């Protein structure tokens, strides 16, 4: 027995080592440990104990968490484990190795014993350091939109919040930090105690519980004082809001009055500007008319001077024309008299010419008659021969 204990390959020490390895993990790599098990090849990570979970989470909300499961004492019962710890293999009723010979019922029994128990995920209330079940690792993370649709998002207070600053003042915080007892999630019932819990802390649990109750009463009193102060502040705030509302209404009334006065003054100023513009336009038109009239007056004076000169010249020309007219009238009367005399003389000459023409025609007719008589006598004489 002592020799077996010293070798570390079996006996009590071997059983202790096997139990320790089964609970807290072994030095065997997962690839070697589960090499011959086809049903476990799709698993990427393994959990050796409730306190030894590992899982990778991403920031992506759509990434699904890998379901981790608890291992038990039947995990890793393969030929390698039997050879390492010098364990006897399992035999069936016929005396053969049930795993090697392929006994279906034995394999199912071993598989059911080796398969870990399922863990039901739940929503973690807080980040507990002693939560050995790792529930928060199996919880599906919800997106911000899902949280906003289901409930109002929690907004933490700022560091400079007056209520929190008064409730948790600097002295009180330092006192809590210096105290040996600190209220944490380890004191919540239903959780496993931390392995690092000191013995004196466990012994002084009731004393610390009384201190915590006393501090809780102090906190309640401080809360009630703060609530009373908040009530007074709310009343002061309501009064202040009422004053602000009245001042705002007065400001709006004054603004409306000023606006109306401004509109009236602006309309009056616009009318005055229009009148001034009309007056300036009339003054400008009168000035232009005055200049044009003055120019016309100057032209009229010059024209009157020219007219007087022209009148004198016309008078002189009129006298000359009158004299010429008299001269021409005299000449015309002389010419008319001369024309009358010439006409009378012409009539007398015409009468003389007509009488001469009549005499000549008479002589011509007589000569023609004589010629006719002579020619007739000669014709008669020629016919008689």
Curated annotation (Swiss-Prot):
TM spans (from-to): none
Top-level taxonomic group: Eukaryota
Coiled coil: 229-355
PTM-bearing positions, type Phosphoserine: 29, 73, 115
Keyword Hydrolase assigned: no
Composition skew (Basic and acidic residues), residue ranges: 34-48
Family annotation (Pfam families): BBP1_C, BBP1_N
GO molecular function term, any single one: structural molecule activity
Low complexity bias locations: 64-75
Self-association and partners: Homodimer. Interacts with KAR1, MPS2 and SPC29.
Function according to Swiss-Prot or TrEMBL: Component of the spindle pole body (SPB) required for insertion of the nascent SPB into the nuclear envelope and for the proper execution of spindle pole body (SPB) duplication. Connects the central plaque of the SPB with the half-bridge. Required for proper localization of CDC5 at the SPB and for proper M-phase progression.
Protein name from the UniProt record: Spindle pole component BBP1
Underlying gene: BBP1
